[in-house]
Amino acid sequence: VFQHYENLPRINPSVTTVQRLDTAEHGDDVYTEVDLCVGFICRQIYEVQNMTWQVDAERHNLRATVDPSRSNLAYGTGSWTFVDCGEQQSCLDFRAEVEPDFWIPPVIGPWVIQRSMRREAIVTSEGIERLAQHPDAR
């Protein structure tokens, strides 16, 4: 489900555009546009991320690294680790770090941003689960 980048808008509706730019030895370069609201401030994030998969017997790990020269993020990394939890279940560990390359009003502190990112992570994990159970669902 998650390996097919074109599924991202179905997984999380905040993702409005996905385009695979390049596939190379170092991974896939993927362009995305994401509409995010933090508090009362909404912003479109555009980014090119290099996506690399690492697979072994125990886990599947997708790592994303933002290319700041082609994004409105100064820095960004993400890691999605999927492990088998038995009984046809997978567990997901998601970690991300981002630094925007645009002004954020001082009233929006780190706590508000973390809360918004946590909400997006939950929406994404629920979307992965929904799509895994019902591949034809929107």
Which residues does each PLM region occupy?
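Glycine-rich portal/gate segments that line the openings of hydrophobic small-molecule binding cavities
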Residues: 19-71, 123-137
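Beta-strand/loop substructures that line and gate deep hydrophobic ligand-binding cavities in soluble
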Residues: 46-47, 65-119
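Hydrophobic pocket/interface hotspot
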Residues: 1-2, 8, 51, 92-94, ...
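Hydrophobic ligand-binding cavity/cleft-lining segments
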Residues: 1-26
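Generic helix-packing signal
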Residues: 2, 82, 100, 125-128
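Residues that form generic nucleotide/phosphate-binding pockets
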Residues: 1, 115, 131
